[in-house]
Amino acid sequence: MKRKLIAAIGIAGMMVSIAACGGDSDDDGKKAGADGYAGETLTVWVMDGSSPDDWQADLAKDFEAKTKAKVKFEIQKWNGIQQKLTTALSEENPPDVFEIGNTQTPAYAKTGGLADLSDLKGEIGTDWSESLNKSAVFDGKQYAAPWFVVNRVVVYNKKIWADAGIKELPKTRDEFYNDLKTIGEKTDAEPIYLPGQNWYHFVGLVIGEGGELVKKDGDKYVSNLADPKVAAATETYKKFQALSKAPKDKDEATPQQGEIFAKGKTGSFIGMGWEGATAIATNPAIEKDLGYFTIPGPTADKPEGVFLGGSNLAVAAGSKKQDLAKEFLKLALSDKYEGGLAKANGVIPNKEALQSNLKGNAAAEAAAPAAGTGDTTPLIPEWAAVENDPNPIKTYLTAVMKGKSPADAAKQVEGEFNKRLAQQQ
């Protein structure tokens, strides 16, 4: 799920007021008495499309039965959410519980805007997947609860692959590459649509190599694009991109790659499962030829590295209903509702034991095997500014795709990369 982060300058501007509000949570946050939390209403912000209406309605009903309190869901848009949430967390009555992008969590935790949920982790989160929970922890404390993630898969055209004589799906990166070459040799189709700036897939390749995009230099973070592991990931990206006619200076959304695929002249692309639905909406006839498989890694026993984009649930440090908020999280993250969300939306749940709910959803089944070893962008508050346009990682990729060595391209963007990492949070 693509989240374009806004400059963290807005977070910095509110840091003092957020921290001042944190901890003022005992006015109404009383423990439930004989009548539970009767008469109270919990405000929960969730992002548009993250949870179905019936999921919310059932949860609200069960929550009221359990606590005697009501829950008010308020639907938010991703566009502008960082500034809106930053402002809300600095005010007298912030949302009690809110959905937050997994890579955004560290910045809010650093400002003091999030309540410490370490006790809740011990109670309900002992079996949360480590790869999902990583983004919810900052400075050794649990500041959010992992809710779900999504990751990229190979979306492919079954007819084109069959026309090329390919009878089995690839299990390794080399097999995948050779199959794409075969498509190019035996059909008129473009083997893969891979623009030069699909940086989320590039991040996955870096993860697969065991590389890091940043490193510590004294007390600050700096670019690590010159690292040999990052260079190896870049060479892999370039090798596959050379099989594509896609522009080297555009990303997967310019134009939407699902719409390109819908024309029926492309063998595959690397994207989110929902991009298959985009293709079908553009050309319903493509549905019968649409398939998904896990991005193959160097060996058959381990999928390619993937970027895990998703959401956490957090409690505002300034909420006056923190005990009630934790009761909400216990229910929302229970197997019933966590599994139900996975089934309804095809997202990867926070426990591996709940992945059985993905059965029958071809895109989700293809994504699940890689989730356990996937990772995110660097989970540091300083990262937020890096992703703002023009993203220096995109600039780096385009430079390599157009002929520069990874080392020279890394040197080209290093100044801008480091400047962004140095911005005050």
From Swiss-Prot:
Gene3D superfamilies: Periplasmic binding protein-like II
Location relative to the cell: Cell membrane
Expression triggers: Strongly induced by (GlcNAc)2, (GlcNAc)3 and colloidal chitin. Repressed by DasR.
Recorded phenotype for the gene knockout or disruption: Disruption of the gene decreases (GlcNAc)2 uptake. Mutant shows higher chitinase activity. Null mutant shows medium-dependent development, only failing to produce aerial hyphae and spores on glucose-containing media. Under conditions that allow sporulation, highly aberrant spores with many prematurely produced germ tubes are observed.
Residues covalently joined to lipid (S-diacylglycerol cysteine): C21
Organism: Streptomyces coelicolor (strain ATCC BAA-471 / A3(2) / M145)
Protein name per Swiss-Prot or TrEMBL: Diacetylchitobiose binding protein DasA
Key words of the record: Cell membrane, Lipoprotein, Membrane, Palmitate, Signal, Sugar transport, Transport
GO cellular component: plasma membrane
Described purpose of this protein according to its UniProt entry: Part of the ABC transporter complex DasABC-MsiK involved in N,N'-diacetylchitobiose ((GlcNAc)2) uptake. Binds specifically to (GlcNAc)2. Can also bind to GlcNAc, (GlcNAc)3, (GlcNAc)4 and (GlcNAc)5, but it exhibits the highest affinity for (GlcNAc)2. Involved in the control of morphological differentiation.
Lipid-substituted positions (N-palmitoyl cysteine): C21
InterPro entries per UniProt: SBP (IPR006059)
Record family assignment: Belongs to the bacterial solute-binding protein 1 family.
Membrane topology: Lipid-anchor
Annotated signal sequence range: 1-20
The protein's assembly and partners: The complex is composed of two ATP-binding proteins (MsiK), two transmembrane proteins (DasB and DasC) and a solute-binding protein (DasA).
